[in-house]
Amino acid sequence: MIVRAARLLRRPFPSSISLFSTSSTNSSSHDADANNNPSTNNTTHFGFQDVPTADKSNLVRQVFESVAPQYDVMNDLMSATLHRQWKDDLVDMIAPRPGCKHIDVAGGTGDVAFRICDRIQRRLPPLHSNFQPPPSEVVVFDINPGMLKVGKERAQEYGYNSINEEDENENQSPPPLQLKWCEGDAERLERFSDNSFDSYTIAFGIRNVTNIPRALKEAHRVLRPGGRFLCLEFSRVQNAMLRQAYEAYSFHVIPTIGEVVANDRDSYQYLVESIQKFPTQIEFSNMLEDAGFQHVQHTNFIDGVVAIHSGFKLDK
């Protein structure tokens, strides 16, 4: 039985929590970089806890192993189903087309990948058409086997032709649309060569990565010139009154929903805390530029409850 990491590290709920960093935009981006870089620190944050850097990925893995069976249901409840629209908006920005090659990192349950596959399928020409585009490929990449298991089961339910890494056969003619499932760490995409993908998405996953700058550099490496990086993530609310209400909801309601629905208050307490530790919109944009992305911008939803960050790889 998996020991819940959040319970091991649980501490009393703080009496006063700020959703905003008071440091300046420019300097805070470099502070965020250092705090997520294990080469400069022996410890890192796991929610509000300081833990050995080498331990964080395993602690995060245990959290998502615990929440995997109820992950999508909890997303609906926590966001009042708004996460569905945010993911639709994310995929709209990609505008996937037949023949494209896409990677969705931390996408275990397939929520984003299925949307991308649907868009591609709608644009595929009839099988009897004289023109057939190259095969499309959508890769779901996640560190947690439990999340991938849920995604594969959903893919089978929806009728997708899924391919596991161990099942790939180079001698077989690929179908028009391939949906692949890969287990691995966002910081290490070494199984993929440089310039492999047209687009890269990560939805509600980057804040759980131990070394965010390293993951961003890997994202830049595997994208083709002209490729687009898109990240959907909880962010910093701009309006003071909304921020206060959102703070109360996050720390008092979400863990309670997790306890009632998923029988796991502690994991959702960690997830709420991890949102507060994530860099601001400007800080994260600066991190994208440091990783080599250009034309970096972000779009806030609900005044910054979540944001979609975008950047392009323009060099070779």
Regions found by a protein language model. Name each.
Residues 12-62:
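N-terminal auxiliary segments of SAM/dcSAM-dependent transferases
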Residues 70, 80-101, 111, 115, ...:
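Conserved alpha-helix/loop element of class I SAM-dependent methyltransferases that forms part
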Residues 101-189:
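Class I SAM-dependent methyltransferase SAM/SAH-binding core
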Residues 187-200:
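A short acidic, Gly/Pro-enriched loop at the edge of an enzyme's catalytic core
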Residues 198-212, 235:
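A short SAM/SAH-binding and catalytic strip from SAM-dependent methyltransferases
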Residues 213-228:
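A short glycine-rich, Lys/Arg-flanked "PGG" loop and its adjoining helix->strand segment in the class I
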Residues 228-258:
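Conserved class I S-adenosyl-L-methionine
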Residues 291-295, 300-316:
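Core SAM-dependent methyltransferase catalytic element
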